[in-house]
A protein has these predicted regions:
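Bacterial Sec-dependent N-terminal signal peptides
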Residues: 1-29, 90
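Generic alpha-helical secondary structure signal
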Residues: 5, 41, 81-84
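Short linear functional motifs in flexible/disordered or boundary regions
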Residues: 17-18, 77, 102
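Short, surface-exposed loop and linker segments with low hydrophobicity and enrichment for Pro/Ser/Thr
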Residues: 18, 48-62, 155-167
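N-terminal zymogen propeptides
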Residues: 21-60, 94
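Fold-level signature of zinc-dependent metallopeptidase catalytic domains
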Residues: 46-91, 173-178, 185, 190, ...
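Metzincin-family zinc-dependent endopeptidase catalytic domain
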Residues: 88-220
Length: 220
């Protein structure tokens, strides 16, 4: 379950902060990476093999979140308060508490529901130590080109490796837009991984520190 969350959560971030045109950019980037790595077919086969119970899990789920802030200049080193607000927005959306929950388009009313997923910043790190759930890594990269440096923020020397994706939802916050010079901007991306599949080391969500975080306007 935890491994399917990054891709689903990306829809929340994108819905909150960007236009439909930008959503297409993120989808194109994600699909291209999966095709280049030969993962698209693997994902389809793996999902086909999942029992129905895993796709429609009942009950509730609490997901520990590890937020990795990878920054070059101080403006990119987003404060704890912004991250806490981001987690609150995620919980509103996934518990049906967002203000416009009742205004969903008629096309989707039949599929609307509350998945009973709660997100919280991790309190224990992979080594068993107490943590705030937030890591901060200063990088020499002025920004990460989403076309050429898609996953550079997820490992040294440019960034930081994910915490165990079977136990945590990893979110990287960094600059993936400032060098694009206008036009279409990729504000975030994620992949749809399945446990044991090649590529699990890049599980998680990447969002832009500026365009991908919209702490002041919660609309979904």
């Amino acid at each position: 379950m935890l491994r399917t969350l990054p891709f689903l959560l990306l829809l929340t971030f994108i819905g909150n902060s960007v236009s439909a045109q930008d959503r297409c950019t993120a989808h194109t980037l994600t699909q291209r990476f999966l095709n280049e790595q030969g993962l698209s077919t693997d994902i389809g086969r793996a999902l086909d093999k999942l029992p129905a119970g895993q796709l429609k899990a009942g009950g509730s789920l609490t997901v520990p979140v590890a937020v990795h802030v990878v920054w070059n200049i101080s403006a990119e080193n987003v404060p704890d308060a912004t991250i806490i607000d981001m987690i609150a927005t995620m919980n509103e959306d996934y518990q049906g508490l967002n203000p416009d929950f009742g205004t969903v388009r008629a096309t989707f009313t039949g599929a609307q529901g509350v998945p009973n997923i709660t997100f919280c910043l991790a309190q224990i790190d992979p080594n068993g130590n107490a943590t705030t759930g937030i890591t901060r890594t200063q990088t020499s990269d002025t920004w990460f080109d989403p076309d050429l440096e898609t996953n550079d923020m997820k490992s040294a020397p440019s960034g930081i490796a994910p915490w165990d994706p079977d136990s945590y939802l990893n979110i990287w916050i960094c600059d993936i837009a400032s060098g694009l010079g206008g036009g279409l901007i990729t504000t975030g991306y994620a992949y749809l991984p399945v446990g044991g599949m090649v590529g699990s080391n890049i599980d998680g969500i990447v969002i832009d520190y500026n365009y991908g975080l919209d702490a002041g306007a919660r609309t979904a």
